[in-house]
């Protein structure tokens, strides 16, 4: 069954719900809305609402919760762009470029608080147990994502980051919000602990596959489709799985080519391209295989839930496959 109409309708509903709490005027609200209105796949709220629908949750409450995780995601993007000094996000100037760093920090703070306002709206009328579980789940996500971002920044000054450290970092920085989205969908539908555990497993493995694919796109993607400069991860010194594997497997000459450009914001285009070529040769196939492995783990977790077929279930299944084949 074609689920595109289901997805399109959900995106419209989530967008309207998010904007309903960000209708204020002036630079603060304009800056806060900028990232939200700048595009995005809305994967996290789609996961949350689809899970809730499958398990019999209330659509209106799921929409508020879905809007909450997307607004929280936008908060992290605004602050990440400041820390990484990124000039573009989805092909448009970042918030701090347009409004300055102080206003961008405030806009991120506002989005953070608005995510809690939205989850409170989702939880009205729910049992105290459900309220506490949902708030604990969302709060844990903020803590874990912050820890992941701190690790990502720490890794920029290291050349000895291991694959295990990388997986731990992306589990926290990226995959945690996918896991939180799936889990919150179950919490709102009052699913049992076994289902909640499997939903988290689906989300965490999906998120890891998503981030590995994102790292690959940073090396192989089209600049116009990505909406940011290619090789920006190399320039910023990001320890992606491609960099980690190549530094471990490469010859002294290959390592030197990588390290000349890695984290060097004044690197020439030729130096960046040379480093990218080495990464492609040494680690691209490995990264693709690793992304597929985590995609398959995500599918296994979903299958273990024994959920009924339908557009929502098909969306969750296809998402686990499509995240490793995307072009942007």
Task: Walk through the language-model features, giving the residues of each.
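All-alpha prenyltransferase/terpene-synthase fold signal
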Residues: 1-328
């Amino acid at each position: 069954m074609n689920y595109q109409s289901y997805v399109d309708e959900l995106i419209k509903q989530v967008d309207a719900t998010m904007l309903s709490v960000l209708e204020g005027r002036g630079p603060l609200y304009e800056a806060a809305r900028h990232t939200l209105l700048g595009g995005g796949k809305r994967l996290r709220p789609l996961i949350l609402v689809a899970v809730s629908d499958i398990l019999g949750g209330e659509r209106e409450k799921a929409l508020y919760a879905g809007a909450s995780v997307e607004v929280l995601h936008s908060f992290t993007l605004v602050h990440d762009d400041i820390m990484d000094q990124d000039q573009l996000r989805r092909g448009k100037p970042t918030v701090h470029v347009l409004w300055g760093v102080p206003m961008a920090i405030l806009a991120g703070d506002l989005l953070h608080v608005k995510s809690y306002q939205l989850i409170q709206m989702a939880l009205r009328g729910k049992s105290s147990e459900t309220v506490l579980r949902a708030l604990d789940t969302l709060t844990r996500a903020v803590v874990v994502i912050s820890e992941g971002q701190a690790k990502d920044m720490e890794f920029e000054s290291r050349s000895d980051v291991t694959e295990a450290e990388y997986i731990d970092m992306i589990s926290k920085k990226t995959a945690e919000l996918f896991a939180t989205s799936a889990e919150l969908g179950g919490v709102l539908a009052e699913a049992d602990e076994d289902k909640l555990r499997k939903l988290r497993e689906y989300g965490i493995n999906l998120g890891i596959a998503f981030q590995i694919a994102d790292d690959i796109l940073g090396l192989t993607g089209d600049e116009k489709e990505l909406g940011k400069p290619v090789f920006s991860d190399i320039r910023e010194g990001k320890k992606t799985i491609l960099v980690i594997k190549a530094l471990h497997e490469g010859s002294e000459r290959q390592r030197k080519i990588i390290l000349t450009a890695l984290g060097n914001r004044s690197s020439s285009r030729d130096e960046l391209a040379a480093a990218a070529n080495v990464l492609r040769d040494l680690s691209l196939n490995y990264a693709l295989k690793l992304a597929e492995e985590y995609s398959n783990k995500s599918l296994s977790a979903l299958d273990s839930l024994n959920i009924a077929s339908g557009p929502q279930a098909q969306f969750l299944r296809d998402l686990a496959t499509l995240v490793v084949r995307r072009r942007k």
